[in-house]
Amino acid sequence: MDVNPTLLFLKIPAQNAISTTFPYTGDPPYSHGTGTGYTMDTVNRTHQYSEKGKWTTNTETGAPQLNPIDGPLPEDNEPSGYAQTDCVLEAMAFLEESHPGIFENSCLETMEVVQQTRVDRLTQGRQTYDWTLNRNQPAATALANTIEVFRSNGLTANESGRLIDFLKDVMESMDKEEIEITTHFQRKRRVRDNMTKKMVTQRTIGKKKQRVNKRSYLIRALTLNTMTKDAERGKLKRRAIATPGMQIRGFVYFVETLARSICEKLEQSGLPVGGNEKKAKLANVVRKMMTNSQDTELSFTITGDNTKWNENQNPRMFLAMITYITKNQPEWFRNILSIAPIMFSNKMARLGKGYMFESKRMKLRTQIPAEMLASIDLKYFNESTRKKIEKIRPLLIDGTASLSPGMMMGMFNMLSTVLGVSILNLGQKKYTKTTYWWDGLQSSDDFALIVNAPNHEGIQAGVDRFYRTCKLVGINMSKKKSYINRTGTFEFTSFFYRYGFVANFSMELPSFGVSGINESADMSIGVTVIKNNMINNDLGPATAQMALQLFIKDYRYTYRCHRGDTQIQTRRSFELKKLWEQTRSKAGLLVSDGGPNLYNIRNLHIPEVCLKWELMDEDYQGRLCNPLNPFVSHKEIESVNNAVVMPAHGPAKSMEYDAVATTHSWIPKRNRSILNTSQRGILEDEQMYQKCCNLFEKFFPSSSYRRPVGISSMVEAMVSRARIDARIDFESGRIKKEEFSEIMKICSTIEELRRQKQ
């Protein structure tokens, strides 16, 4: 970018420039290779923090498990996971006392959700551990596979389409002595190619039925697959994140629904709201503390950091919290909510792909799968890896590690926030019974603590008491990484507060630029990002105008669509020049067709096609927006699309932008290299499921009808619908008798084929 950075700082106060010190420009770091090492680190660290707990063995799976609950109270500042049950329950009781009826009301709201949620709720989300294939899959495919397996094993409650009925099947599946699954495998054979007469490897994909006994099934059902967290800025080391399987997901969803409902009612919770709403909520708490700290009181704020939040949380503690929160509720509701924490207390972490070995001398590479780590000779590994493996060995079963304590990242964000807020709640004067008092904000593992007291000693005493109270519930405030300031300056979830929130503009930098979806979407997303930042992030008019010019420049270079009258030569310039010369109204050409840019900061809210429509030549309009044009992939034309925008920090955000379908809204085809691998069978299944879904939507155009999950139930629904429609059409004379009987014949054939398949 040809911008002199010093110009940006001429007229802004220093605290506004803090955001430019962030590692947010440029590409974020990605991980390569396997996540096995990072996962072992997580498992070993988690056990180390709880090492003084009690060891037991799971009777079903034989996995060794460590239980640190009610363990020894810490004597030093090292992080530890020894939460005390009675302290957690007491914190919950005080939270309820300060917010009468909060748990009761949230339970009622959740009960309603539990009874209404459909099983297709689980198709949301990206990669999911698919226990039938023992690898990650898109959520919809993983769910379809699970349901297919359940049905072929006689578990059919899920056919009602309600999530709660699917969860009944999950519970029953765990009691079965064995389960039959279909797996994909790959055969390789050497054959001679007729054309070249060379030997080539031919791959064929097969499916085979396999029986899994109760123990192996339970291990799979309790497994969290692990991957490396990508694109994390400001860190030297990568870390592992977990993706749970379909058995756990539904239960977690209900627990988080309950916790979300509680968080919405707590003024100290930074979840589930975001953006400007969150800023307003936080500003309220700060205002309260500053108005209450009369002239006699001091007020200080800690920008807090917790050490290894997830690894010191404990599912058994969450079970205690849920038991308390649901204390007067119906038995079925209490049971369904307690299953998630119980499953997490028995969870297994899958170690990923294993290690890759390379011999430079012999040019050989070989992969040691995670399953072999239990038995392989350790002389091949370097010292640090050897230590890791030695430590983890007692915990290994079938390539997964037993991991009872700890929570893994991002599983119970809402519920852990409730725990954090319950400690902030204890800072009221009626509980501290002394001259100091505290309040604050909590959002998952991030917190800000505001302490008020008559003098510095009081502030110190307040902070110490908060620190010790946290230790009792397994929260470890880091003394090294937290810092304290006079109230009025602090940071919370990357929002910087200085007598009001300062716009942290650099957070948004990565989302500027060309997304690379297609010409139409990229233009729309680019201007929407600039518009949104003018609204939310103090992006001033001059800077916005500059951002817009840079974006257009970037866009033209990306798609090689410089103006038709430019001197720049690219692969497209010949065609674009020709178009420019034939066009009467040149202002009507889209930027991607070599036209001029008509955007300025006043009209960013208008899609480019609409902005230029009146200026376009008629034949250009006809080519651009013609549903019969074979290059336009018209999905249904929605007025609003969602783009995934990467802010520099936190999860990818979904951002709405206006979508006008034109010849520029193409969808790229999938990379073909996958077709030669063992993933191919899985890909074919996925495509089949996709085709089936598309067909289904043609049969049931009404959006009020929710589609069932799994191919078999969809086929049943379509066949019966076809019969009904055919009968109505026949009786009203819209189709002839021959056509009617042909439709009936096809329906019977489909059913017959399905019976044979089963």
From Swiss-Prot:
Keyword Phosphoprotein: yes
EC category name: transferase
Matching PROSITE patterns: RDRP_SSRNA_NEG_SEG
GO BP, one annotated term: symbiont-mediated suppression of host gene expression
Catalytic activity: RNA(n) + a ribonucleoside 5'-triphosphate = RNA(n+1) + diphosphate
Comp. bias regions, Polar residues: 55-64
Enzyme Commission (EC) number: 2.7.7.48
Primary localisation category: host cell
Chain spans, region Promoter-binding site: 249-256
PTM comment: Phosphorylated by host PRKCA.
Domain of life: Viruses
GO terms for MF: nucleotide binding; RNA binding; RNA-directed RNA polymerase activity
RdRp catalytic domain boundaries: 286-483
Region (Disordered): 50-76
GO CC term (a single one): host cell cytoplasm
Entry keywords, A to Z: Eukaryotic host gene expression shutoff by virus, Eukaryotic host transcription shutoff by virus, Host cytoplasm, Host gene expression shutoff by virus, Host nucleus, Host-virus interaction, Inhibition of host RNA polymerase II by virus, Nucleotide-binding, Nucleotidyltransferase, Phosphoprotein, RNA-directed RNA polymerase, Transferase, Viral RNA replication, Viral transcription
Intervals of motif Nuclear localization signal: 187-195, 203-216
Subcellular location: Host nucleus; Host cytoplasm
Family the UniProt entry places it in: Belongs to the influenza viruses polymerase PB1 family.
UniProt subunit comment: Influenza RNA polymerase is composed of three subunits: PB1, PB2 and PA. Interacts (via N-terminus) with PA (via C-terminus). Interacts (via C-terminus) with PB2 (via N-terminus); this interaction is essential for transcription initiation.
General function of this protein: RNA-dependent RNA polymerase which is responsible for replication and transcription of virus RNA segments. The transcription of viral mRNAs occurs by a unique mechanism called cap-snatching. 5' methylated caps of cellular mRNAs are cleaved after 10-13 nucleotides by PA. In turn, these short capped RNAs are used as primers by PB1 for transcription of viral mRNAs. During virus replication, PB1 initiates RNA synthesis and copy vRNA into complementary RNA (cRNA) which in turn serves as a template for the production of more vRNAs.
Name recorded for this polypeptide: RNA-directed RNA polymerase catalytic subunit
Gene that produces this protein: PB1
